Amino acid sequence: MWELNMSYLWLAQRLLQSDRASGMFRLGVTADVAAALAALSMKQMNDLASAGQLICALRPSRYGVLSALTRATPPVDLVRVHTAMALAGLALPDEETS
């Protein structure tokens, strides 16, 4: 569990440092969560990773998304566009209900 959590936190920080907007989209997090993830120290990352609970979630929770990601592969560019479009609807929580 620790390895998976630490890998997620490390990847999250790298994505957010590289391109914050793209990282937020790929991680499916809000600006507040992105800022908190980017600001974590190594000790804080270790503490979170050691919590004994998975701190990330797989987003393809709808059959259509999972099916689109696993079907016979059409041209690579089309796969990337379709995947981005399918995940875009799941990327950020509905902020109107917050």
Curated annotation (Swiss-Prot):
> Which segments does the entry list as coiled coil?
none
- Give the record's keywords alphabetically: Activator, Bacterial flagellum biogenesis, Cytoplasm, Disulfide bond, DNA-binding, Transcription, Transcription regulation
Checking InterPro entries in the record gives: Flagellar_FlhD (IPR023559), FlhD_sf (IPR036194)
List the molecular function annotations (GO) for this entry: DNA binding
Q: Where in the cell is it found?
A: Cytoplasm
Return the GO cellular component terms, semicolon-separated: cytoplasm
Q: Which GO terms describe its biological process?
A: bacterial-type flagellum assembly; positive regulation of DNA-templated transcription; regulation of bacterial-type flagellum assembly
* Keyword Thylakoid in record: no
Question: What domain of life?
Answer: Bacteria
Pfam families recorded: FlhD
Q: Does the keyword Transcription apply?
A: yes
Q: What is its main location?
A: cytoplasm
* Subunit structure, as described in the record: Homodimer; disulfide-linked. Forms a heterohexamer composed of two FlhC and four FlhD subunits. Each FlhC binds a FlhD dimer, forming a heterotrimer, and a hexamer assembles by dimerization of two heterotrimers.
In the record's own words, the domains note is: The C-terminal region contains a putative helix-turn-helix (HTH) motif, suggesting that this region may bind DNA.
Please report which protein family the annotation says this sequence is part of: Belongs to the FlhD family.
Q: What is its biological role?
A: Functions in complex with FlhC as a master transcriptional regulator that regulates transcription of several flagellar and non-flagellar operons by binding to their promoter region. Activates expression of class 2 flagellar genes, including fliA, which is a flagellum-specific sigma factor that turns on the class 3 genes. Also regulates genes whose products function in a variety of physiological pathways.
This chain's protein is named Flagellar transcriptional regulator FlhD
- Please give the organism: Burkholderia lata (strain ATCC 17760 / DSM 23089 / LMG 22485 / NCIMB 9086 / R18194 / 383)
Q: Which gene encodes it?
A: flhD
